[in-house]
Amino acid sequence: MFPSFPPGISGDEFNLLFYGYQSQEEIRALLQNLSLAVSNTALELPSGRKLPLRLSGGVSWYPENSTDLSTLKKYADFAMYQVKKAEKGYITEFDLELFTKNAKETEMRRLFHRMLNEELFTYYFQPIVSAADGSIYAYEALMRGNLPALTRPDQILQLAHEEECLHEIERLTMFLSAKSYATFLSTHQIRGDELLFVNSIASQYMNHDESVAY
């Protein structure tokens, strides 16, 4: 028996509600047969070329995953998109652990973009001491994030790589470390003749306009 709510989601996506069965295994067998039937079907295009069909789907279970219909739909939708992200053409069941992990990753990405937009970085200056006389002749600028969940440079750089924001990290590092140097100089925390070493991303050097502004 199918569905008691509108099946269409968008485009080629649909909801199906299976109920009245004695076990999950019965439904799994039906889904397997449905997937097989679709995979054995092809659409013939006007050119005569045949386009094979594949079925990608996600399954959530009542009451194991949730007793709320909208939540069950959301969980099934999440499972389906995991299929589409990996290898299309099969049906998978909702995984709460994967869903929780994905939610955490989404939140970390949101925090990362907030960090970029609001420039929430601090650059600590690690002194470099001369072996000859013990004086400080340079500082190395060490980046730290200002959000509790996102402080370590390796976390920040990994997210920057995944979100294709390495250039923005490079630009901010150059400008904000120089700004920190100027602040320390104006407050007499450094002499002003020390060198400043900055860890740069070799493939992400500043463009002409950024270099002029710097």
Regions found by a protein language model. Give the residues of each.
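Active-site core of bacterial EAL-family cyclic-dinucleotide phosphodiesterase domains
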Residues: 104-161, 199
